[in-house]
Amino acid sequence: DFRLKLLFEEIQELATAALDIEELNDKDDRYGLMQNLLKEMCDVVYVIKGMAVSFGMDFDGAFKLVHKSNMSKLPLIKDADGKVMKGLNYEPPILEGLVH
């Protein structure tokens, strides 16, 4: 699928941009690299939003609900590996009506 191939390419570019910052020794170059990282993040979101539109999905509406669901995990409970666990207040997102 074209969009999936494009998404993988954009994720690779995002990973490269993030690694460039981690490997940076000169703070003078950091601002430009941070701008590039932000651009690559936006490219990934752009492709994902395009994919959602092509499938008739309300990405922005779903994102808000998933964010609300993720915030319901508070207070944070982490497992031994540091992964955030679903706490007592967790509510899964209900995405009904967001796929057309």
Language model segments and positions:
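Flexible "arm" and connector segments at domain edges
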Residues: 1-100
